[in-house]
């Protein structure tokens, strides 16, 4: 029996190319979807059509996104079209985590399915600890942060330590990183924890070593859809290719012109070689834009057409009207900020736009300070997107560590984080004794403490504290089996003394931390399984960019963070050589770097729906130095006939207030 279609006319709302993609059901499909062309609508319509035509049951369909927000939106939109249950919609990491939760023991490496996922900060802490132990590593020259970046890159490329080639370890830093990588993986194994790179890395190892396991998931996921394919790294690409190799019913949606995450492992070549990977693939282009005006689309197309390594496509719209793009020359970066502040003030006071629909998108973080000053002086409400995220705050990470050690007693990082929080009279000497004992016997710190307590080889005060803590951890584990996550976490907060510690501080900071913990409890209350919450919180930290409404404040954010968003009015400041395109990108990656910078410009331009301002300064203060500058080459790539080019000085008399 066919699942019930909620909206019988959903195909009639698609344009010709969208409908062609939604009706395509057999064989590989590459959907080249330009900015604002309705790709999510097509993806969800395609899923609904596959189910409605009885080509697959919902649980045989796998849809992969890059963020939890995108996964949730896709799921909701599918359910608005067709009444079905059991769809597999999630991020790369969440889907990989589910597979490993069921299959990790088939890797025969020593992991079990009670593994936990450690955060970025915990990964860095572990690297630091390893570097400290290796006395021959100069930590000032070869910093743990750099070593961690290299290890993460290798994982994104699908490379375990034993698969690194000579070319991967040519440089002294790479040689050291390999040594640390080997020790790092051993530590993860002892603690029964994985980092984010491991999720795809071990999935791929699992599929290669266990053809029967791969076949099981190929049969399970007969239809595969991948969103934002241009942002995939090598490990994600290999994972998708293996899963799709049996039935070849894979639909990859992306826009190579919006591939802007090369610095974090994204490989634009994945989308460019799709036709080679899947012979006979169908290619459909979505070029009709439903977001921006004609001048904005013309600007975007003219800029991106200067890139050589791309699939040819041209955005167009039914609308023939639209404001010309304003390109403003300013004397300095301070004047640039004042001009933008005054222009925003005028737009809002004239009731042309709401402040919440206006954004300033910068290429680099150092550009934001001048806007903060200008907005404060002009009493313009604003918010800077960035900084510390919720799940990265100290108190949240502490509570997460308590939960993790309760679920997985071998989690060394979690135990070390909470062992003395609140204070338990466990000094440095006791901690070192525990670490050394564990290291010598190749066991976890938790197991080491148990053995030390049995021997009695520790100070009396520490003995009582450690015995009490271990007993509580055992109790919390048992409680998680029989009680709801929210009840157990509340018990942890009370029994551990953590909440009492904050209450005793009686400071504004402590009060804020308690409020954050209460907010965390509200999130936990939505989960029936604590493992689901732990995975969710970890993946949110890695994947989410912005999950908030725009309110009545102007948004200031980087161009990278703005991808996927849209605003009525967009200001693009700092379009000068050296700032944008970034000199660092040009120096390090040459033509490849320039093409990525141009894609970033394309993303910035296409965030605007109605009005676009591009500004550049004749001089700019960069790290305390005044630097003379030239307009960005990208400005010269925008045709004169769709622009109004002027100087901010011409407008001083009309609206600047002193």
Swiss-Prot record:
Stretches assigned to the UvrD-like helicase C-terminal domain: 294-564
Keywords linked to the UniProt accession: ATP-binding, DNA damage, DNA repair, DNA replication, DNA-binding, Helicase, Hydrolase, Isomerase, Nucleotide-binding
Record bears the keyword DNA-binding: yes
Any Gene Ontology biological process: recombinational repair
Domain UvrD-like helicase ATP-binding: residue ranges: 12-293
An annotated GO cellular component: DNA helicase complex
Catalytic activity: Couples ATP hydrolysis with the unwinding of duplex DNA by translocating in the 3'-5' direction; ATP + H2O = ADP + phosphate + H(+)
Enzyme Commission number(s) from the entry: 5.6.2.4
UniProt entry tagged with the keyword Transcription: no
GO molecular function: 3'-5' DNA helicase activity; ATP binding; ATP hydrolysis activity; DNA binding
Similarity comment: Belongs to the helicase family. UvrD subfamily.
Name assigned to this protein: Probable DNA helicase II homolog
Name of the coding gene: uvrD
């Amino acid at each position: 029996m066919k699942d019930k279609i909620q909206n019988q006319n959903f195909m009639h709302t698609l344009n010709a190319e969208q409908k062609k993609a939604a009706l395509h059901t057999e064989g590989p499909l590459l959907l080249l979807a330009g900015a604002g062309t309705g790709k999510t609508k097509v993806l969800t319509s395609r899923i609904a059509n596959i189910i409605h035509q009885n080509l697959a049951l919902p649980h045989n369909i796998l849809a992969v996104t890059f963020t939890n927000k995108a996964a949730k939106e896709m799921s909701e939109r599918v359910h608005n079209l067709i009444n079905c249950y059991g769809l597999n919609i999630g991020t790369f990491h969440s889907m990989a985590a589910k597979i490993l939760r069921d299959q990790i023991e088939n890797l025969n490496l020593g992991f079990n399915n009670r593994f936990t996922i450690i955060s970025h900060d915990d990964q860095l802490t572990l690297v630091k600890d390893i570097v400290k132990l290796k006395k021959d590593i100069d930590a000032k020259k070869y910093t743990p942060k750099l070593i961690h970046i290299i290890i993460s890159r290798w994982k994104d490329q699908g490379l375990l330590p034993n698969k690194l080639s000579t070319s991967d370890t040519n440089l002294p830093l790479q040689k050291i990183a390999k040594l640390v990588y080997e020790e790092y993986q051993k530590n993860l194994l002892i603690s029964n924890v994985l980092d984010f790179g491991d999720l795809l890395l071990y999935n791929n190892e699992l599929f290669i070593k266990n053809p029967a396991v791969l076949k099981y998931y190929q049969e399970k996921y007969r239809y595969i859809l991948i969103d934002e394919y241009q942002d995939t790294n090598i490990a994600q690409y290999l994972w998708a290719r293996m899963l799709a190799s049996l039935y070849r019913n894979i639909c990859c949606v992306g826009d190579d012109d919006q591939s802007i995450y090369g610095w974090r492992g994204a490989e634009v070549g994945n989308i460019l070689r799709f036709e080679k990977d899947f012979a006979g693939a169908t290619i459909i282009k979505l070029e009709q834009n439903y977001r921006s005006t004609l001048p904005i689309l013309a600007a975007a197309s003219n800029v991106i057409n200067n890139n050589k390594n791309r699939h040819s496509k041209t955005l167009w719209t039914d609308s023939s009207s639209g404001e010309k793009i304003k390109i403003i020359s300013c004397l300095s970066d301070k004047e640039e900020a004042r001009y933008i502040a005054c222009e925003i003030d005028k737009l809002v006071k004239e009731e042309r736009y709401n402040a919440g629909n206006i954004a300033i998108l910068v290429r680099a973080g150092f550009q934001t300070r001048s806007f903060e000053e200008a907005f404060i002086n002009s009493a313009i409400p604003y918010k800077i997107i960035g900084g510390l995220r919720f799940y990265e705050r100290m108190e949240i990470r502490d509570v997460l560590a308590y939960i993790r050690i309760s679920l997985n007693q071998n989690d060394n990082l979690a135990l070390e984080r909470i062992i003395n929080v609140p204070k338990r009279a466990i000094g440095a000497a006791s901690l070192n004794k525990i670490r050394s004992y564990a290291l010598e016997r190749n066991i976890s710190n938790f197991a080491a403490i148990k053995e030390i307590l049995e021997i009695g080889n520790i100070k009396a005060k520490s003995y009582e504290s450690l015995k009490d803590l271990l007993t509580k951890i055992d109790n919390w584990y048992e409680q998680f089996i029989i009680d709801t996550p929210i009840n157990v976490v509340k018990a942890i907060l009370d029994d551990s003394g953590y909440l009492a510690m904050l209450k005793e501080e009686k400071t504004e900071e402590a009060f804020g931390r308690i409020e954050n913990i209460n907010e965390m409890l509200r999130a936990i209350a939505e989960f029936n399984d604590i493992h689901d919450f732990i995975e969710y919180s970890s993946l949110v930290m890695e994947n989410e960019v912005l999950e908030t409404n725009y309110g009545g404040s102007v948004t200031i954010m980087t161009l990278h963070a703005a991808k996927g968003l849209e605003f009525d009015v967009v200001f693009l400041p700092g379009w000068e050589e050296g700032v944008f395109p970034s000199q660092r990108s040009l120096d390090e990656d040459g033509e490849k770097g320039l093409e990525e910078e141009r894609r970033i410009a394309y993303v910035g331009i296409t965030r605007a729906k109605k009005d676009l301002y591009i500004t550049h300064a004749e001089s700019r203060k960069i790290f305390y130095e005044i630097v003379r500058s030239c307009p960005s080459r990208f400005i010269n790539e925008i045709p004169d006939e769709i622009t109004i080019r002027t100087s901010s000085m011409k407008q001083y008399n009309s609206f600047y207030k002193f």
